Amino acid sequence: MRMIDIIEKKRDGHTLTTEEINFFIDGYVKGDIPDYQASSLAMAIYFQDMNDDERAALTMAMVNSGDMIDLSDIKGVKVDKHSTGGVGDTTTLVLAPLVAAVDVPVAKMSGRGLGHTGGTIDKLEAIDGFHVEIDEATFVKLVNENKVAVVGQSGNLTPADKKLYALRDVTGTVNSIPLIASSIMSKKIAAGADAIVLDVKTGSGAFMKTLEDAEALAHAMVRIGNNVGRNTMAIISDMNQPLGRAIGNALELQEAIDTLKGQGPKDLTELVLTLGSQMVVLANKAETLEEARALLIEAINSGAALEKFKTFIKNQGGDETVIDHPERLPQAQYQIEYKAKKSGYVTELVSNDIGVASMMLGAGRLTKEDDIDLAVGIVLNKKIGDKVEEGESLLTIHSNRQDVDDVVKKLDSSITIADHVVSPTLIHKIIIE
């Protein structure tokens, strides 16, 4: 088999066999196939696309290029959730203890965040003493006993994806549905998931700006999952404004605690219940999405979800008293109100810009080596559709420096107030095939 033949075959719009895809991935990981040939094939895929069989084969070739996490010692169906990323996305912190409270095992591998705020692990490390460096045996034991544990990413998972992702980044082949879908799904499958729930974001603060693109990606990932024996569902949710009200690590953790108490923002609560219902159904703990939702609402109302979060924190060395004493979380030195310059209705909150503003305060990382300030960030006091009076606070800046002129300047261009009401949509579609 020759790589040049595979490139030409895809260039001319033909279907690659599983053997050809395996030959490419194996050779590329070993270093036998050079970057220039790999980038040539990536560009051919970009223009000619791949069918469902090719996408599934590419995904599994990437899964098989490295280690796979074995979660077979954990009882029950392990359901993993993946979000394509957004601003203020606190869902994992709420979902993990919530679905665990209705007997769904959550064995979560998480990374540290690059971008606007930290990842799930950074947020959890805002809790004094919380640690994620636990060995596999302890991880399995904690999930079996309490249904939920979070561990830092380890092992050599999907090396082919890491290599191909870096190549796509510099060759103009990032925005390709088969390449994005196989990249995301290979990581989830390698991490040991039996079933997968996907939250595909669309809008100004999302990777997929249009609903059409988000739908294409969601269908692609659901089909890959189902084709390789992992029950998969997706929802398409809106990221034209940040989710919830908090953007920042300790601030988002506080918001997660409020949501588990039943006092969280409406949009975050609704998204969590929608995603959680799918997880409960896929884990065979309810027959319908309606039944699953009722179980989750009961877990919040009874306090079971909050109790589960407390035990989870305690199990991993954290100070669980932060649940009842949120003032023990890292606090920023200064709270600065950003006020409306005129009266009207909020019609636009540019997610990315607000995320960048939060990053400028120190809430996120530009490189893996950067330190994060867990206390800082932004809390939205108004969201799209809300009425606002001139001089009223639109948001609160939590900062450890007094001079935030650069942040204010960024925010000036990210908020629009007009004299008409806009009603945002939170959940656009649910995709099951």
Swiss-Prot record:
Q: Name one GO cellular component term.
A: cytosol
Q: How is the cofactor bound?
A: Binds 1 K(+) ion per subunit.
Write out the catalysed reaction: uridine + phosphate = alpha-D-ribose 1-phosphate + uracil; thymidine + phosphate = 2-deoxy-alpha-D-ribose 1-phosphate + thymine; 2'-deoxyuridine + phosphate = 2-deoxy-alpha-D-ribose 1-phosphate + uracil
The EC number(s) given in the record are 2.4.2.2
* Record-listed phosphate binding positions: 81-83, 92, 108-110, 120
Q: State where substrate binds.
A: 168, 187
Q: Per the UniProt entry, what are the Gene Ontology biological process annotations, in alphabetical order?
A: pyrimidine nucleobase metabolic process; pyrimidine nucleoside metabolic process
In the UniProt record, does the keyword Amino-acid biosynthesis occur? no
What this protein needs as a cofactor is: K(+)
State any single GO MF term. uridine phosphorylase activity
Any idea which positions bind K(+)?
88, 90, 243, 246, 255
Q: Which Pfam families match?
A: Glycos_trans_3N, Glycos_transf_3, PYNP_C
Task: Give the matching PROSITE patterns.
Answer: THYMID_PHOSPHORYLASE
Keywords attached to this entry? Glycosyltransferase, Metal-binding, Potassium, Transferase
Subunit structure, interactors included: Homodimer.
- Give the PANTHER family listed for this entry: THYMIDINE PHOSPHORYLASE (PTHR10515:SF0)
> What is the role of this chain?
Catalyzes phosphorolysis of the pyrimidine nucleosides uridine, thymidine and 2'-deoxyuridine with the formation of the corresponding pyrimidine base and ribose-1-phosphate.
Q: Which family does it belong to?
A: Belongs to the thymidine/pyrimidine-nucleoside phosphorylase family.
What is the official name of this protein in its record?
Pyrimidine-nucleoside phosphorylase
